[in-house]
Curated annotation (Swiss-Prot):
HAMAP family linked: MraZ (MF_01008)
SUBUNIT field: Forms oligomers.
Origin: domain of life: Bacteria
Keyword Hydrolase among UniProt keywords: no
BP-aspect Gene Ontology terms: negative regulation of DNA-templated transcription initiation
SpoVT-AbrB domain: residues covered: 5-47, 76-119
GO MF annotations, alphabetized: DNA-binding transcription factor activity; transcription cis-regulatory region binding
Gene designation: mraZ
Protein name: Transcriptional regulator MraZ
NCBIfam families xref list: division/cell wall cluster transcriptional repressor MraZ
Cross-referenced PROSITE patterns: SPOVT_ABRB
Taxonomic source organism: Oenococcus oeni (strain ATCC BAA-331 / PSU-1)
Keyword RNA-binding belongs to the record: no
UniProt similarity note: Belongs to the MraZ family.
InterPro entries given in the database record: MraZ, MraZ_C, MraZ_dom, MraZ_N, MraZ_sf, SpoVT-AbrB_dom, SpoVT-AbrB_sf
Amino acid sequence: MFMGEYQHTLDDKSRLIIPAKFRNQLGDTFVVTRWMEHSLFAFPKDEWDKFEEKLNKLPFGAKDARAFRRFVLAGAIESDFDKQGRIIIPTVLKEHAQLNKNVVITGSGNGFEIWSKDNWEEYTAGTAENFDQIAEELTDFDL
């Protein structure tokens, strides 16, 4: 399970060091794609395959389903690590996530998210203010 929060920097060549704990869980190749709230999501290949299967079951007749599928699949890239444990973030993904030098990598269960530090701080501040209400709304999920 991917968990934790890590602060890293994106270098001038758009390379990002991934925490060693996450590299060990990802394997040799993995998928990075556009995600919600101007973030990116990295899936181990086996988790991506499961997710992609679910995407392929979305009804083509539903406009929102088509939009979600297009957005995620068009932004997806297969990636691997260099010898220093870095990945290259392509321009299209970098722009989507509004990444600059300061980046936050957050564990998210079956994968991890990549955020600009500014966006992450704004998101977590809002979530912290509403956390009790969010938790209450999730009682139906038996957490």
